[in-house]
Structures are given as structure tokens and as C-alpha cells.
């Protein structure tokens, strides 16, 4: 499971699961084991906005902090994502 960064953001690792690269760019956030159980899932748009698809065990404050971090670093994160997947940014529902 590739991590976007080696450090935690608001107490959570930001990563994606290599089997999920068939989807558009997204970010999982998990504090312990890097599994989907209990993790949040954010789909990332080309303008740096995110759609929260699953909140997991994160509280609202942590969700907002992570969304802000993604907004500030989405280009760098996309560079890593695109090494694994040809699928681009999220285009909405």
C-alpha cells in the first residue's frame, strides 16, 4: 500500500491501495494498520477539492484538516498516484 507521505497528517497516514488503482485518484486515511476497515476515503478533483466518500472513524475536525492538507499537496500526491494508475482526478458524481 503506497503511502503518499511517510508522516501522519492529523494522526493519520494518507495512502492508496494498489488494487484500487482502477478507480480515479483517491486518498485513504487510517491511523493504525493501512486497511480499508475504519479508514476514510477521499476522492480528489483536479481543482484540489475532495469528496468524502467514507468517513470511517475520523471525526469532522480531522476530516477538514486532511481535506486542507490534500488541497495544499494534491499535485505532489497526483504525481505518485500517476506512477501507479492511468486514471486521473475525480470528475464528480
Question: Where on the chain are the PLM-derived regions?
Answer:
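Short linear motifs in intrinsically disordered/low-complexity regions
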Residues: 7, 50, 87-88
